[in-house]
Amino acid sequence: MKKTRINFIWLIGLLAVFLTTTGFVQSNIEDNAHILNKETKTLINEKNNRYLQTKEQPQIVVITVKKLNKLTPKTLDHSKRTVFIVGGQKGSKRNVQFFSTKDLHGAFTADARANILRAEVDQLRSQNNAKFNQGLRFVFRACATKVDQQYQYALDKYDLTSSEQNKISHPHSVALPIALALAFLIMGIVYVLKKFGHRNSEPHN
């Protein structure tokens, strides 16, 4: 009995050493809601495989769950150099949020996270799975770009293009010209109406 107990303790110790030395890296994908397509999974795995070749070995994990709220991953506080993108689905509704570990908070400020999600909000809420995956890939690539910039990695084909980064950096850049055009149009209509009303109010001979 004593020998069996010693062997059990020895095995537990060996397992602990193994998990410590190997880093016990979490799986890149946990598709519990079964909504990720092949293209999305390929992107996630290929980019993370590149990260394995770096000194820091950051990771971007994508998780899907069958709920819309309380999406914070349980392993967030125990992880390092990791971004978690969580897609929730319940019925026809979908919700996407992402979280970063403390060592990446500088790259993922509240404004940065909001701008990334806002840029693809229609796709991320779409009931069309192809469009949803398109939006999710954009979020993943945006996160990858932030991580690469944080660790000064060379940008690659998995990162956002300059125009896509612009879309996030200046979320109101497209809306502003439209708003100005509408303002001028309204001013023009008001001017015409006032002029027309003034003419009608003039006495006729």
Feature annotation, model-predicted:
Residues K3-T4, K131, H172, L176:
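Hydrophobic, aromatic-rich alpha-helical transmembrane segments
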Residues M1-N28:
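Hydrophobic secretory-pathway targeting helix
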